[in-house]
Amino acid sequence: MMVGFPGKFRRYIMEEYIVNKGKNETIEVDGINYQRLCIKTHIITDKDSIVDVAVKYAKPLIKENDTLFITEKIVGCCQGRAIPLSEIKPRKLATFLSKFVLKTPYGIGLAMPETMEMALREVGTIKILFAAGISAFGKVLGQRGWFYKIAGEKARAIDGPCDCTIPPYNECVSLAPLNPDEVATEVSNAIGCDVIITDINDLGGNILGASSPKIDRDLFVKILKDNPLGQSDEQTPMGIVRVC
C-alpha cells in the first residue's frame, strides 16, 4: 500500500517501510538490484538503547540475508554523544580553523567553532593542525578532501545542527559513536542479521562499523551512496538493504 503525506513531508509507505522523498527505493550496483527500506522510529535520545530500538522497529521486518544499516548519529545519541552547544566553549584556535572549512547545504561539519572545538578534543590539537596544514597544501594543488584523510573518521563524523535538524539535536553537536564494530555486533546478535553503522550524507560516506569482517564495506557505500535515510527531518535513522 502507498500512502502520501502532504507537502515537503511527502513520503511513500510500503507495508512498514518508508521511501523518503527524493530518494529511490532501489539501486543497481554491479548488476544487482538492492532495495533500501527506511524505518521510521520515535525520536531517539540518550535514554534509549540502540539494541532495544533495533529489536522494536527492525527485527519484525527482517528477512533472510537482509542487512540492517544504522546512522552513526543515532548510535552516538544513545551513547550520550550529542553535546549541547551551551556546554561547548570554543577556544580561539577552533574559531580560527572553522573559518577555513567549506560550508555545504548537506551539513555544517566542522565549519562552526563548536564542531571544530569538539574535533580538537576528540582527535587532538596536533593532529587537527597537521591535517589543516596538509589540507591547505592540497588546495594549492587543486585537491580537496586531504583534511579528513589525515584527521580520520572521528573528525569526519562530527556534525552540527542545521535549520532542518529535529529537536533537541538542533542545539547539539553530534560526535562519532564509540566502538561501532562492537555496537554493530551487539545489535546483530539481538536481531539475527548483519548490521552496519553508517556515516552517509548527500556528499558520500563511510561504513564506521560492521558486525562481521566478511561484510563488504565498499559495496555498502555504493549501495547507500545517495543517502536513502535522508539529511533532514525524516526521522528514519535505520533501514534494511535487501537484494531484490
Regions found by a protein language model. Name each.
Residues 9-244:
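N-terminal and secondary-structure boundary signal
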